[in-house]
Design a protein with these regions (language model features):
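NAD(P)+-binding Rossmann beta1-loop-alpha1 motif at the extreme N-terminus of oxidoreductases
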Residues: 1-52, 59-62
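Rossmann-like NAD(P)(H) cofactor-binding subdomain of soluble oxidoreductases
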Residues: 54, 60-142, 158
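Internal alpha-helical scaffold of NAD(P)-dependent oxidoreductase catalytic cores
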Residues: 82, 115, 119-123, 142-229
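General beta-strand structural signal in soluble alpha/beta enzymes
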Residues: 99, 124-129, 169-173, 232, ...
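NAD(P)-dependent Rossmann-like dehydrogenase/reductase catalytic/cofactor-binding core
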Residues: 185, 189-196, 221-231, 235-326
Length: 326
């Protein structure tokens, strides 16, 4: 199959490698020609995916229209904040569009497949999400993920396209739940990192993650998702790996906040985006819209955007009114 991948970061590059090794003709689009020139010379993406050799058959392209021309599938792997502008360039594209971007658009409250219905209305969107770090996928470490689409046939097509001996793809028709799980867990990962930065232990993080999955599910259901999706790979699975792994940008971002650094300065200095930072703002607005109680995410928002002291936020969570667990 002829495929274009939009976004030459870690995830786009790792998926490009995966799809080329699966026998597909793959073009990886990046917006900085000089970076692509480096990749052509070294057959590596040292900036975003260091230490990984890339197949020579992986085509690199800085011209967007050339990259997507005559393709049967486009994979979008760009930050959520530029997702609308980038996918608007797809125009009347009518093939499969697989989004691996995890975020919620602030102005509209839409997930990325929702944005696609506006920017590329003739395309068939599929969300691919789960507990995945690009470097582990690129090293062929066994990984499982979910392809979510309202169209069962589209999800199955993506399942067949991406599945390998080290990369197992499940399907779901709850695309909203799949995407919300992937987006909201990044906010919780920042909370987990703040806990680490404050020097708290395993008890604290276990309690945080367990209570957080409850509010992720509560908000997701209010938005129209299925509750069971949040205990699957794209919910609980992704939450666990992002909150506990040393690879997690969002957890690392939170750890720096917990140690006293300013969130905006951390974000400005990062090469790769910590999606939980903008998503905290979007999730807070979404929860207010649906009148859903999200105490953990509320405190993350207050720390990141209102300058609240992290230790005070933890005290406020612990001193909330006592209640049954379930």
């Amino acid at each position: 199959m002829k495929i274009a991948i939009i976004g030459a970061g870690a995830w786009g590059t790792a998926l490009g490698r995966l799809l080329v090794l699966g026998g597909n003709e793959v073009t990886l689009w990046g917006h900085v020609p000089a970076w692509l020139d480096e990749m052509r010379q070294t057959h590596r993406n040292e900036r975003f995916l260091p230490g990984i050799d890339l197949p020579r058959a992986l085509h690199l392209e800085s011209d967007f229209d050339r990259a997507v021309r005559a393709t049967e599938c486009v994979v979008v792997a760009v930050p959520s904040q530029v997702f609308r502008d980038v996918t608007r360039r797809l125009g009347d594209y009518s093939g499969l569009v697989v989004t691996v971007t995890k975020g919620i658009e602030y102005d509209t409250g839409l997930t990325m497949s929702g944005v696609l219905t506006e920017t590329a209305p003739q395309a068939t969107p599929v969300a691919l999400s789960g507990p995945t770090f690009a470097v582990e996928v690129a090293r062929d470490i066994p990984t499982a993920i979910v392809a979510g689409s309202r169209h069962a046939g589209a999800a199955q097509a993506v399942q067949a396209l991406f599945s390998r001996s080290s990369f197992r793809v499940y399907t779901s028709q709850d695309v909203l739940g799949v995407e919300l799980g992937g987006a909201l867990k990044n906010v919780i990962a920042i909370a987990a990192g703040i806990s680490d930065g404050l020097g708290f232990g395993d008890n604290s993080k276990a309690a945080l993650v367990t209570r957080a999955i409850v509010e992720m599910r509560r908000l997701g259901v209010a938005c129209g998702a299925r509750p069971e999706t949040f205990t699957g790979l794209s919910g609980l699975g992704d939450l666990m790996v992002t909150c506990f792994s040393r690879h997690s940008r969002n957890r690392g971002f939170g750890e720096r906040v917990g140690r006293g650094e300013r969130p905006a300065e951390i974000a400005a200095g990062m090469v790769a985006v910590a999606e939980g930072y903008p998503t905290a703002r979007s999730a807070h607005r979404l929860a207010r819209k649906h009148q859903v109680e999200t105490p953990v995410m509320d405190e993350v928002y207050a720390i990141l955007y209102e300058g609240k002291n992290a230790e005070q936020a933890v005290r406020d969570l612990m001193l909330r009114d006592l209640k049954p667990e379930i």
